[in-house]
Amino acid sequence: MQSLGLDGGESRVRWISRSEASALILAAGTAARQPHLRNFVRLALSTGCRKNELLALEWHRVDFERSHFRLECEHTKNGKRRLVPLNSGALSALRDQLDWVARHCAGSEWVFASSSGRRVGNLQKGFVAACARAGIENFRIHDLRHTFASWLVMEGVSLYVVKDLLGHSSITVTERYAHLSPNHGREAVQKLLPL
């Protein structure tokens, strides 16, 4: 697990490695009382969405053909609509979840529905237990979002792209990840022609 302390009293940024993420997904899959937890973790790590954005997700906003889902203004922190692109991992998690919903609460409008078909409201206990089973300490649900952003920046993705994917209203918030970019300075100066 990696962490970054921020100046000015801002909250910490924690992220986990890919092997820790695999262990967490495996541990989340054993949560008998929260069978949707595994797919929630997979989707959060693949999209960077906030917990409430995912828990409020309805099937009619998921477009499997175009590989994205829509977050409406009332579901986002900054009140702006956004399209969330889906990679193969996110699509797989959504398909698995669709399967579960079809078997246990067919007709539910919620992606993360309980067996009664109602929207899942809280994952905290199951998530904490899954972290313990995976041997991951001091890791919150929101840290799945930090993990997504950290992985992207470490892969060289522009902070502006990460900002848009996370739905940040300002690049200032996203800049907390800037130091993770492996070659941000080196790549910039290479764009200049030699004199």
Label the model's feature ranges.
Residues 36-38, 44, 137-155:
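Short basic/aromatic active-site micro-motif
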Residues 43-44, 57, 151-155, 165, ...:
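Short alpha-helical segment immediately N-terminal to, or the first helix within
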Residues 61-68, 137-138, 157-176, 187:
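Short, polar N-cap/turn motifs at the start of nucleic acid-interacting alpha helices
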Residues 19, 23, 82-85, 92, ...:
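DNA/chromatin major-groove-contacting recognition/catalytic segments
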Residues 7, 15, 71-78, 166-191:
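Catalytic-site neighborhood detector that most strongly recognizes the C-terminal catalytic loop/helix
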Residues 19, 66, 75, 87-137:
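Active-site/catalytic core of tyrosine-dependent DNA strand-transfer enzymes
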